[in-house]
């Protein structure tokens, strides 16, 4: 990025309506409690439609039947998505059994959706079941607070089953950061858990009365794995270890992938290195980054409000100096680190603690009983006998963690009998999509329902060119908000309209480069024609170990994005 054009620290102007809503909400209460009792509509009205997001929910409807219901003069079939707060993706088997039962008994779709933010979502919760879902989560020690809207969202942590001691330390920090940055309002407990109102005034010492200007995402990452895709996140703590023990973090700030089609003020951006900090300063630094973004982020234009834009406007050195001032530290020079991959190691891995860990590939994270593959039942049966925990990965897979040797055969038998260990290609293991249709209101094109058959066709191209065991990191996202993280893929498809996508190429396998748009608004046959030609060239012309994305850059097929604020749209 450039320091040549620093802008104002605070953007003056008329505040966005979201700022009015937050200010008037009485610390996120609004009239949600009253709205719950309105049986005339299946949805939430007015500001409450947006306020429920702070409580971990989005109001959606089934877009497959929207037109049909409109023709019948019925309102859309409103139902809520709920996203759990689950730092590092760790969930106990007792908790898993509770969420399995709720999904079966109280959701329209009956599924559990693992997400690439290391948590799970329920889709299709009717309004009458909204309060019960929060109470169910609370009863097993979980909540949905701050998993959506203008807060620090679910904190990610590398799912490294081999480095068990290091993972345990990093996971503890992910939990501490998550807890430290949580909102302090009692609105969640009052509305959902029926806790009595306390006479004291609410205060938000970190987030402030109007919370953050926009969503904020945090990771703790253990090199050499970049499984959590740090460059998609606002604030990243890269673990630095000595003799297998965590000693501190490198801090990287200002990553983010969401854009708006045709809006050249928006761009995907990788995170910038700030420096190294010893462990004892972690929470102070996390708070300083968040409060600097709170005070300097753009509250007049939500499309330009994320940390990545603040960093570009004020300049990296200015932002970094303010974080140092607020945290009371000076960053040390970045310590050496490198990434070698970001996919999950599917199958059994033995940890240095001699426990076994079984990583199960879950296509698109959708846990459901399919014909001949009862995945949901299989995981429930494993949860009933497993003494360790489950870990949800940022690749939408699931790890059965900490399995003793004596239980290994029994758990493998259950997994195999329920279709949880069916062999899949390396290409399928490295392909991912967001939910999109039918539930996401922002979806422009299919993603989760499109990817499996599209992957079949890409597998056929690899087979045709004699490289069936190769893989290309491939992501499909249904709209430019980018939940599928296509903007860090070697092949990224971004939904433009039904059946049409923008094709991005030139990312790399380790997730440190933004791909550039190669072709705009094209159909699946056009995409496959382009990929067929380019994969053929890659198979013939690549250098030893060269990934597809690196090849497209070296061969001059695509220019690399070097400074997204300046050249993302070129």
UniProtKB/Swiss-Prot annotation:
UniProt entry keywords in alphabetical sequence: 4Fe-4S, Amino-acid biosynthesis, Cysteine biosynthesis, Heme, Iron, Iron-sulfur, Metal-binding, NADP, Oxidoreductase
Pfam families (alphabetical): NIR_SIR, NIR_SIR_ferr
Chain residues that bind siroheme: 483
PROSITE patterns in the cross-refs: NIR_SIR
UniProt remark on cofactor binding: Binds 1 siroheme per subunit.
SS bond list: none
InterPro entries hit by this protein: CysI, NiRdtase/SiRdtase_haem-b_fer, Nit/Sulf_reduc_fer-like_dom_sf, NO2/SO3_Rdtase_4Fe4S_dom, NO2/SO3_Rdtase_4Fe4S_prot, NO2/SO3_Rdtase_4Fe4S_sf, NO2/SO3_Rdtase_FeS/sirohaem_BS
E.C. no: 1.8.1.2
Source organism superkingdom: Bacteria
Enzyme class: oxidoreductase
Annotated pathway: Sulfur metabolism; hydrogen sulfide biosynthesis; hydrogen sulfide from sulfite (NADPH route): step 1/1
Cofactor(s) needed: siroheme; [4Fe-4S] cluster
Residue sites binding [4Fe-4S] cluster per the record: 434, 440, 479, 483
SUBUNIT field: Alpha(8)-beta(8). The alpha component is a flavoprotein, the beta component is a hemoprotein.
Family as reported in the entry's similarity comment: Belongs to the nitrite and sulfite reductase 4Fe-4S domain family.
Record protein name field: Sulfite reductase [NADPH] hemoprotein beta-component
Native source species: Salmonella heidelberg (strain SL476)
């Amino acid at each position: 990025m450039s320091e040549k054009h620093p802008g104002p620290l605070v953007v003056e102007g008329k505040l966005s309506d979201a700022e009015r809503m937050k200010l008037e909400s009485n610390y996120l209460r609004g009239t949600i409690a009253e709205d719950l009792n309105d049986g005339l509509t299946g949805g939430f009205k007015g500001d409450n439609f947006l306020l429920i997001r702070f409580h971990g929910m989005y109001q959606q409807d089934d877009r497959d039947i929207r037109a049909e219901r409109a023709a019948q003069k019925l309102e859309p079939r409103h139902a809520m998505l709920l996203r759990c707060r689950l730092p590092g993706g760790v969930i106990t088997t007792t908790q898993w059994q509770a969420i399995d039962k709720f999904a079966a008994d109280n959701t329209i779709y009956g599924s559990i959706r693992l997400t690439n933010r290391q948590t799970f979502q329920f889709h299709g919760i009717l309004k009458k079941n909204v309060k019960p879902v929060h109470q169910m989560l609370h009863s097993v020690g979980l909540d949905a607070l701050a998993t959506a809207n203008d807060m620090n969202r679910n904190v990610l942590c590398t799912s490294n089953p081999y480095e068990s001691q290091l993972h345990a330390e990093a996971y503890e920090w992910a939990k501490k950061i998550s807890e430290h940055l949580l909102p302090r309002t009692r609105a969640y407990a009052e509305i959902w858990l029926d806790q009595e109102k306390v006479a004291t005034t609410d205060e938000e010492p970190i987030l402030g009365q109007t919370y953050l200007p926009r969503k904020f995402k945090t990771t703790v990452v253990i090199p050499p794995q970049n499984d959590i895709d740090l460059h998609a996140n606002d604030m990243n703590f890269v673990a630095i270890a000595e003799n297998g023990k965590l000693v501190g973090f490198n801090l990287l700030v200002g990553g983010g992938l969401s854009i708006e089609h045709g809006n050249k003020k928006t761009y995907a951006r990788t995170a910038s290195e700030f420096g190294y900090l010893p462990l004892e300063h972690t929470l102070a630094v996390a708070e300083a980054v968040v409060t600097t973004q709170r005070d300097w982020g753009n509250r007049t234009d939500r499309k330009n409000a994320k940390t990545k834009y603040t960093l570009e406007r004020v300049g990296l050195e200015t932002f970094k100096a303010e974080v140092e001032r607020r945290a009371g530290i000076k960053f040390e020079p970045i310590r050496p680190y490198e990434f070698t991959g970001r996919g999950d190691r599917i199958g059994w891995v033995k940890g240095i603690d001699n426990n076994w860990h079984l990583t199960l590939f879950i296509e698109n994270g959708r846990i459901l009983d399919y014909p001949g593959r009862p995945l949901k039942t299989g995981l429930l049966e494993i949860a009933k006998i497993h003494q360790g925990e489950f870990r949800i990965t940022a690749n939408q897979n699931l790890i059965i963690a900490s399995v003793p040797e004596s239980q290994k055969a029994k758990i493998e038998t259950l997994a195999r009998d329920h279709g949880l260990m069916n062999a899949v290609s390396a290409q399928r293991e490295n392909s991912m999509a967001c939910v999109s249709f039918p539930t996401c209101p922002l979806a422009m094109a299919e993603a989760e329902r499109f990817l499996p058959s599209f992957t079949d066709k890409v597998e056929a191209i690899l087979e045709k060119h004699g490289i069936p065991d190769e893989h290309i990191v491939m992501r499909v996202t249904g709209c430019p908000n980018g939940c599928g993280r296509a903007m860090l893929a070697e092949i990224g498809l971004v939904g433009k309209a039904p059946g049409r996508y923008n094709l991005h190429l030139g990312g790399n396998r380790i997730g440190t480069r933004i791909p550039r748009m190669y072709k705009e608004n094209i159909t699946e046959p056009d995409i496959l024609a382009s990929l067929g030609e380019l994969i053929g060239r890659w198979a013939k012309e690549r250098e030893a170990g060269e990934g597809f994305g690196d090849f497209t850059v070296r061969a001059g097929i695509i220019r690399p994005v070097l400074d997204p604020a300046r050249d993302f749209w070129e």
